[in-house]
Every structure is written in structure tokens, then in C-alpha cells.
UniProtKB/Swiss-Prot annotation:
PANTHER family (alphabetical): HEAVY METAL TRANSPORTER
Stated name of the protein: Putative ABC transporter ATP-binding protein CTC_00753
GO molecular-function terms, A-Z: ATP binding; ATP hydrolysis activity; ATPase-coupled transmembrane transporter activity
Domain ABC transporter: residue ranges: 1-143, 179-416
Amino acid sequence: MEREIAFGLENFNTDINTMKRNVSEVISLLGLNKIRDKQTTEISGGEKQRVAIASVVSMDPQIIAFDEPISQLDPISAEEVLNSIKRLNRDLGKTIILVEQRLDKCFHMADRIIFMENGEIIGQGTPKNIPENIVNKYHLPTITYIFKEAGLQTLPITVKEGRDIIRNNKFQDLKEDDLKFKEVVMEIEKLNFEYERGYKILKDLSFKLHRGEIMTVMGENGAGKSTLFKIIAGMIDKYKGKVLIDNKNIKSLKLKERIKKIGYLSQNPNDYFGRKTVFEEVGYTLKNIGEYKEEKVEQVMKLLNISYLEDKNPRDLSGGEKQRVAIACTIITDPEILILDEPTRGMDAEAKENLGEIIKTLAEVGKSIVVITHDSDFAGDYSHSVMLMFNGEIVAKGCARDILYNSMYYSPQISKIFKNKCNIISSKRAIELLKVI
């Protein structure tokens, strides 16, 4: 890890004494002492981000630009990275430019905010003074938008401010009936997985997924979430236990059957791209299984609002555009089970809302959806059930409202505001409640 931090200094031909001093100081500043002797392959996602930050800071630039540094991180790791960024500004006087979609985490940190659209600056302001043309759902933190939509004059930008606003109000807990799913489409029985060196990644996992269910899977980076669903998607076959799809062992399914049963979106959309245009890319799997129809490709591209990209090279797109193209590649075969690993990464609020509505529509027609995410607000708005993983084990699984509302780290922002007042996890329900105060 130390060598990684020193790499930039080596390229600048920095003398050894200066290099040692800079690396040591940056390691202390960013709290990396515990992992200084580890390989970069052995550390968590949050630690990797902080090492990357340290690599830049060691060269002592005056301006540091961060492009979505917390987009793939769990809540705890995200806070660690943002705290490191704050220290660079506060303690070292660095000028920070932060590009980020997770506004709830960082909006309040800014001295100045620049709003862009279609390559143009459409407004500037501060967290407490936002231009009127910017005050809409897609340019505000979730909690700010919720209070604005409810008609309140005082708009919070942090959980504490939101709690202060409703401090003297009383609410009744929601009494909604939980959906009762009947038909099991996937069952995992005593699944275990370990690397060749004997380190156990997954430990005796068992759970079920039902037809029409939207299940969100959450947990810290390195908890085993992606590994579990790579096994279910058939990408890893050396495991112990059973993966049953419609009561059939997945190992007995032929490739075409598996493609029709399970659609899998990996964390990296670039994994899907090898064709010259987006249109070719989206239709590629259909050609492979002998079911290509041009109108089907057009239909899916329209659904995900990517028709305007059809002639572009998928590798030339923005992060959010790549993500939507990869999702189109995943759902084009109309699979019964859809597994989406970090599907909202790089998406703005509008794209996330559109994706959420697509997921709801698919579930309503009987598709089963698994969403692996760190986005608690997205989970609160669209999940039927939630499964929490820690260190390769399932530590909780159940109704989304029960799991998310009672979680310390994975509850949506709005749940934190209503804590001990109302068991709410959904933005829409929060707006309804706030309209009457």
C-alpha cells in the first residue's frame, strides 16, 4: 500500500527523504496506519478509495478534483472517505472540487455549489441559498426535496435539521399490510464458498426469493454480496450447497435456459461492451440465442431512455449512460429473475427514479428482482424485502420497512428524521405525512 502511495512521487523523481516524509504524513492524516503493510488487493473498497486519495495528496497539489468517490461504497466507508476529504480542506487548506450524485452525503459540506445540465452551468449557489430555477427534485438532497414538496417553508439539508423541524409533531405508525408472496422461484440451501487458500467468503447461506418480489441486498464492502449472486448467476461453480431455480438445480440448466431464467448486471458496466454501437450491444445476446428482433431492441432502449445513444460507442458514454445500456443488455432476454449489482451507480435522481419505476413494473408482471446496493433511499422507495449481509453471513432478512427503519447504518435519510416518531422508509409516504403538519 505504501508503494502505491509513493508511485506518483517516484514518477516526479522525488528524493527519497521527501518521499518517505510525504507518504508517512499522508498515511497518518488519512488514518491508514493499520493497513500500511497490506496489499491493495487485501483491503476494503473504502480503504482503496482512501489509498487513492493518499496517492494524489502525497504529491501536494493545491486543487484536488474527486469524480464520484463514494458511488460504490457502503454508508460507513462513504463517511470515512468524505471525512478524509473534509480534513484535506479544513486542515491542509486544499481546494476541493467534488462531483457526486449522492447529494444527501455531501451537499451540506460545500461552500459553493455549481449546477450543470447538458454541458452548461445553469446556476450557482450555496447549500442554504439555491437559485429558484434549481429548486427541483433532481438537484436537491432527498430530504430537502421531501420537505419542499410537502409545502414547508423551512427546508433542511441534514438529518439533524429535519428532526428539529418536526420535533414537536406527533405521527402514528403505518399499518400497511405486508405483501404475502406465495410462489418461490429461487431457493438457496446451505451455500458455502471459499477461495483455494481456505478463506471462507460465504458461510452456510439459506434464503428464498418469490415471484414478483423486489429484494434488496445490503451490507459493507467485502461482505460477500457480489460473490453470492455471481454464484447464483452461474459465473462461479466451485461452491457447496444448492441453488434451485423453479426447483431445478442451476448446475443442470443449459446456457440458453440459464440466460432465460436469470439476468445479471455486474458492478462494472464495461464488462458488457464489445460492440461498436449501443444498438448492436443491446441486441447482441438476442443474436447469440437465436431470438433477435430489431423491434425488441428498440422497445428496451426506449424503456430505459437510451434511444438517442443508439449510434454511439458504449465505451464513450458517461457513467450513468453506461449503466443504463448495461441494464438494457441484461433485461433484453426477458429473464424471470433479474439480479442488479449496484444499478444506481453514477445515476442522477431522475435516472434512479426511472429505474425504480421500471423495476416496479417488472415485478408487477411477475419478474423477481434482486438489487444489490448501498443506496438506502432507493431501497426504501422500491423494496418489498431486505437482506443484510456481514462477513459472509446473512444477519437479517425480512420486510423492507422492519429492516430498514430499525437499522443503525442502512436506514434511509427520511427514516432517520422520523426515528421514534413513525416507522417510515418511503419518500412518497413522508411527503403525505408532512403535508398535514
